[in-house]
C-alpha cells in the first residue's frame, strides 16, 4: 500500500538521518583519510567491518584494535589473524584492559599473527590513534575498532574519559 510520499520527500528525509554513534561512524575531512569508528570487538564483527570497508577503499586499509581485559582470551589471536588477512596495516593497542596487563593482552593478540605484515604496537590508545590518522593518506581508510560508542577506558577498576570519535575529530580538524 502506498504511503503517499513522493520520492523527493523520501529522499529529503533520508538525507537527514544520522547513523548510530560508534557503529560504522565515518569521520572525514577533505584531503585526509576516512576514519571509521566501530564497536567491532569480536572476530566475526571485525571481519565483517573490514570486508565492508575494503569494498570502498581506494587506497590502503588500516586496522587499529585491541581486546578487552578479563574477557575471552581465545578471541585475541583470532582477531589478529583476521586483521592481518583483511587489512594492509595493523595497529595494536589497549581496549579496556580492566585488571589485566595491557602488554600481556597485546602479546596474546600477537600470537595470531603470521609475521607477513608489519605491526605497530602502541599501548597508549590515543597515541595509536594519532599514529594511524597521521600515517594514512587521503585515499586510505582507517578503522578504529573495539570501543565504538564507549566514552571511557576501563583500567584497574577506574573509568577514564576516552572517546575514539572525539579524538579523531580533534586530529582531523588540526592542520597537518
Predicted regions and their residues:
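ATP-dependent carboxylate-amine ligase
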Residues: 1-176
